[in-house]
Amino acid sequence: KTAEFRIGQLITNESKFTISCPALTDGTQYVYDGSAFEPEVTVTRIEGNKKLVKDSNYSVTYTDNIHAGTATVSVEGLGGYVGVWQKTFAIAPRDLTDSSVELSVGGVTDGSYQTQYTGSPVEPEVELTYDGQKISTTDYTVSYGADHTSRGTVTLTATAKDGTDFTGSRSTTFTITLASIGNGGYTPANGFKIGAIEPQPLVDGTATPQPKLYYNGTELVMGTDYICTYEKNDSIGSDAVVILKGIGNYTGSVKKTFKICANIADAEITVPDELWCECRRDGHCNRR
């Protein structure tokens, strides 16, 4: 068997050569910015203080030098020079509090995003960017304040995952507004539905039905989510009106008509004092 090898001056011989990479000794700190970090390296022959020529007398290569973590710079002799020199350097993750990082909720970054109460936890679209470039959602988690269901201001926090190009966390706020059940007319707002109202009898001179109200298929609670008031609800045969008004997490109002019918309890039933009939042979009866 034969093996090929080069004979030349060994650049790692510290008595003959100095290999310098100032960025690795002067306190330079590399922080992830999406670009490749390539600290400059020079090789000098001590005798005569002669600098060797990069790419002619030696080559420099870098590995793992973009993302946060440990990068390596390698120098290898070329031509009449041999040997390999390696050093590692650290690339720190970018802190999410950096001014070049932006956290947007619902497309806005100033905390002014508003969304309507839904009855369920509200988790709007969240986007984290660095220098205008979207950060992968696999690099961070999103958490919410204690209550992101009811109306009010909610704090949202994005926290970088370990082992990614980022560290720390960044927070913003958004607002959950009251859900409007309607604009005062006879058409409920989107997502709301009023249950059917059967004809109502007068009780103590008025008819006061309490129709069911649904939001996104969930039945709301009378007295907690809405109240009812009435118009024209004291006359039989009229088109009475019930007004459902939002309270609690709801606002706005919507109307629905209903019929008022006579109460059978108020009816007078009379029966003749004497009622008889005469039946004939043909099967017919004569009432008398």
Please annotate each region the language model reported.
Residues 4-49, 93-133, 177-218, 263-288:
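Solvent-exposed, low-complexity, repeat-rich "mucin-like" stalks and linkers
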Residues 1-6, 50-82, 87-89, 133-167, ...:
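Serine/threonine-rich, repeat-prone extracellular segments and beta-strand-based repeat modules
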